[in-house]
């Protein structure tokens, strides 16, 4: 099998597929509150295009798929997309990242269709604050979604918490306490300067050492763990006696580019080899032309930088006062 390897020796076996740029929330670090323009439906990859693309990609070693958005559960055919991917025997793992507003309704059907596990965005455990950060989200719907995911067996369940200075950094111990009784993985993620978030990044960024300081102040003893399926770049720990775990993902302060094994496919059919790099290849016209398609995929991988050089990119954007990246919901979270 010919593997998808870049010039630095990194083998790519994992792809994140955005199935929509639309979302029912407007999280402060992801999207502006108004003035958004979304892709017309005909510009978005269809179920058949996504499945055809993946039937080719598995021949080159891709074996893990994460479905993202936007909010992927807004797709009326999301269960059929999962079922189509689940019918490809070479795919070992199918996961989804969701805000969980509709997860309680769809979790069982998704599990039956072949979904392996779920990541849920949850940035506050306080109703009013959660509503403010998401600009309209309902915390109870997320909690109901978590419960339903547990009931149907979508394990491991991971909760993604973007740490935002002055907005939810006083809830760290609340989230840590959440792991004591629930078999879930809380993942604290550094605030990233992407698209809409780029202009306010420095004001809201907190290094993830803050997590360990909170542990120590609360008197929590913790130890590293490394047995969580699909843990990716997360460094994981368990508080003594807890059922669940917590992890830290620090793409800003300690990037993990040297072990990056992932590609991204945007909802409109562009391959990106690096989340923080502008270069992308439009593969949609060639989904039925496997030779040309794989040439473009390999070209994207060949051009992948050794690391994302985020600091340099930020400096350029601050000077021009104009972020050049797509917003996160356009790339796929």
Swiss-Prot record:
Enzyme type, top EC level: lyase
Cofactor note: Binds 2 [4Fe-4S] clusters. Binds 1 [4Fe-4S] cluster coordinated with 3 cysteines and an exchangeable S-adenosyl-L-methionine and 1 [4Fe-4S] cluster coordinated with 3 cysteines and the GTP-derived substrate.
Residue positions binding [4Fe-4S] cluster 2: 257, 260, 274
Keyword Transmembrane among record annotations: no
Catalysed reactions listed for this entry: GTP + AH2 + S-adenosyl-L-methionine = (8S)-3',8-cyclo-7,8-dihydroguanosine 5'-triphosphate + 5'-deoxyadenosine + L-methionine + A + H(+)
Keywords: 4Fe-4S, GTP-binding, Iron, Iron-sulfur, Lyase, Metal-binding, Molybdenum cofactor biosynthesis, Nucleotide-binding, S-adenosyl-L-methionine
Residue sites binding GTP per the record: 16, 66, 97, 158, 262-264
Pfam families to which the protein is assigned, alphabetical: Fer4_12, Mob_synth_C, Radical_SAM
Cofactor(s) listed in the protein's UniProt record: [4Fe-4S] cluster
Amino-acid positions noted as binding [4Fe-4S] cluster 1 in the UniProt annotation, renumbered to this chain: 23, 27, 30
Binding site residues for S-adenosyl-L-methionine: 29, 70, 121, 192
Pathway where this protein functions: Cofactor biosynthesis; molybdopterin biosynthesis
InterPro entries referenced in this protein's UniProt entry, alphabetically: Aldolase_TIM, Elp3/MiaA/NifB-like_rSAM, MoaA, MoaA_NifB_PqqE_Fe-S-bd_CS, MoaA_twitch, MoCo_biosynth_MoaA/MoaC, rSAM
GO MF term set: 4 iron, 4 sulfur cluster binding; cyclic pyranopterin monophosphate synthase activity; GTP 3',8'-cyclase activity; GTP binding; metal ion binding; S-adenosyl-L-methionine binding
Alphabetized Gene3D superfamilies for the sequence: Aldolase class I
A single GO BP: Mo-molybdopterin cofactor biosynthetic process
EC number in record: 4.1.99.22
Quaternary data: Monomer and homodimer.
Family, similarity comment: Belongs to the radical SAM superfamily. MoaA family.
Function: Catalyzes the cyclization of GTP to (8S)-3',8-cyclo-7,8-dihydroguanosine 5'-triphosphate.
Protein name: GTP 3',8-cyclase
Gene name as annotated: moaA
